[in-house]
């Protein structure tokens, strides 16, 4: 019953706040990445908390609940960071063993104060098991080196969750990087559907935020 109510409220909200014409306005206004006022309302609706566990003050509606929202957003071609910052990033953050970091990031995602993008793809073909980006231990941090492509909403994100080969065990790890860290170069682009993405180069960026998740 709660899932049905969520779907109904989402449909009504988007019909009122995000008609198909909204995408055209963003597209024709210098490729604006998303409507910030609309995003604020989505946060207030609780959509950013849908898949976050109650332990972290989330709504714990699961992927079925979030799927209801994404389905309706797809019908209206609604542009927002919910795919990158909520679906993709929250899922990977949940894998971390660092509870204090998880609590902090989940809170920032839920209140909309921070946006997070996943940086994983390295070429034109999706191959999640292959990465040329490397992560090496260096004193009190890590050295990250490599290039990522097609980073969704990379131009507006505060953090990147980056996949890399851990030099110590050759396994794929994920780590959190401040988007403004020294040694990161951004090349922002626009998809044919007017959505923005970035190609990002990490050149000896020192990570102090947390141990990588393996």
Model regions and ranges:
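A generic, well-ordered mixed alpha/beta core segment in the N-terminal half of proteins
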Residues: 97-113
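A short core secondary-structure module
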Residues: 119, 147-185
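N-terminal glycine-rich flavin-associated loop
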Residues: 78-100
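Amphipathic, small/basic residue-rich leader segments at the start of a protein or domain
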Residues: 1-83, 104
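Flexible, small-/acidic-enriched active-site or ligand-binding loops
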Residues: 130-132, 150-151, 178-206
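Residue-level detector of conserved catalytic or cofactor/ligand-binding positions
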Residues: 205-213
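A short, Trp-centered hydrophobic/proline-enriched beta-strand micro-motif
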Residues: 112-123
